[in-house]
Amino acid sequence: MSEPADIAAMTFEQALAELEQIVARLESGQAPLEDSIRMYERGAALKAHCETRLEAARLRVEKIVMGAGGAPASEPAEFG
């Protein structure tokens, strides 16, 4: 299942901010059931988008190392 086009166009920061708003509204318990379900579904899509963006950023990060002969080189950074 692909995410809605408006979510796909969001930056990580935009998606995270909206996700935080949704969480706050859901935690308040004030929304009707159907609205809560819609918010939950959108929140799940936003969460997936944020995870995808974070993974893409992680893959782009490289560690600069001294290669053979003292020349600088880069290699994928290790996380975890």
From Swiss-Prot:
Transmembrane segments: none annotated. GO terms for molecular function: exodeoxyribonuclease VII activity. It comes from the Bacteria. Keywords: Cytoplasm, Exonuclease, Hydrolase, Nuclease. Its EC number is 3.1.11.6. GO terms for biological process: DNA catabolic process. It catalyses: Exonucleolytic cleavage in either 5'- to 3'- or 3'- to 5'-direction to yield nucleoside 5'-phosphates. Disulfide bonds: none annotated. One of its GO terms (cellular component) is cytosol. Its main location: cytoplasm. Pfam families: Exonuc_VII_S. It is found in: Cytoplasm. The keyword Nuclease applies. Heterooligomer composed of large and small subunits. NCBIfam families: PRK00977.1-3, xseB. Belongs to the XseB family. Bidirectionally degrades single-stranded DNA into large acid-insoluble oligonucleotides, which are then degraded further into small acid-soluble oligonucleotides. This is Exodeoxyribonuclease 7 small subunit. It comes from Phenylobacterium zucineum (strain HLK1). The lineage of its organism: Bacteria, Pseudomonadati, Pseudomonadota, Alphaproteobacteria, Caulobacterales.
